Amino acid sequence: MLMITSFANPRVAQAFVDYMATQGVILTIQQHNQSDVWLADESQAERVRAELARFLENPADPRYLAASWLAGHTGSGLHYRRYPFFAALRERAGPVTWVMMIACVVVFIAMQILGDQEVMLWLAWPFDPTLKFEFWRYFTHALMHFSLMHILFNLLWWWYLGGAVEKRLGSGKLIVITLISALLSGYMQQKFSGPWFGGLSGVVYALMGYVWLRGERDPQSGIYLQRGLIIFALIWIVAGWFDLFGMSMANGAHIAGLAVGLAMAFVDSLNARKRK
């Protein structure tokens, strides 16, 4: 048994313990003068301490309260700060995250005004050999979305995952992941369905894979994704592949994006271990 930390407020201690339980780490609380948090499996100590540092930065983060709800441990002893909606958006998103979101919204509005086809003529993957040197096309397909649900779903994930990467690892890392995954997921998708596709989902899947594996292999990176969410991503890929919902999905982009994210996370976490 290893004591991780002590909290003066028992509800704060319980919130942290509940959250770590959702991550597969079992902690116990022993009440003395304060609430002492103990870890049974000492091999998980590094991961727990990394998460503790994040928790202490912002114990009011909604994910901690959500974990307490799942565990049935909510009460009035712990008071969470409340943030206005846009303040919460600003807190998590860096400049690259915002620029991408704004660009997608502007393109979406243009598609509603001018029509999908007109915008795709300018932004779609090169659909004619004469366009192969219009290099922006290899990336701008990610800006196009064909329904309100499509853009909302992708931008929510982009904000959640991309914002975390940018805040923890820097704008440069997010740009690199975005450009590589947009290029390779677009290439794969055009092999599947031709050049007439669009959406940020290939990049989103890359971020899912990157954040999950980097968090698993390098907890001190400060980024992480719950295993349940990566399982959801895999189920969604399978559902799209077998057309279970009767929806048109960019299956090639999803698979390629996820593979890119996992590969980049593996390399980055390997380099991080070598630097230690």
From Swiss-Prot:
It comes from the Bacteria. The active site is at S201 (nucleophile), H254. Its EC number is 3.4.21.105. One of its GO terms (cellular component) is plasma membrane. The chain crosses the membrane at residues 94-114, 142-162, 169-189, 192-212, 229-249, 250-270. GO terms for molecular function: serine-type endopeptidase activity. The keyword Protease applies. It catalyses: Cleaves type-1 transmembrane domains using a catalytic dyad composed of serine and histidine that are contributed by different transmembrane domains. It is a multi-pass membrane protein. Keywords: Cell inner membrane, Cell membrane, Hydrolase, Membrane, Protease, Serine protease, Transmembrane, Transmembrane helix. It is found in: Cell inner membrane. One of its GO terms (biological process) is proteolysis. The keyword Transmembrane applies. InterPro entries: GlpG_N_sf, Peptidase_S54_GlpG_N, Peptidase_S54_rhomboid_dom, Rhomboid-like_sf, Rhomboid_protease_GlpG. Belongs to the peptidase S54 family. Rhomboid-type serine protease that catalyzes intramembrane proteolysis. NCBIfam families: PRK10907.1, rhombo_GlpG. This is Rhomboid protease GlpG.
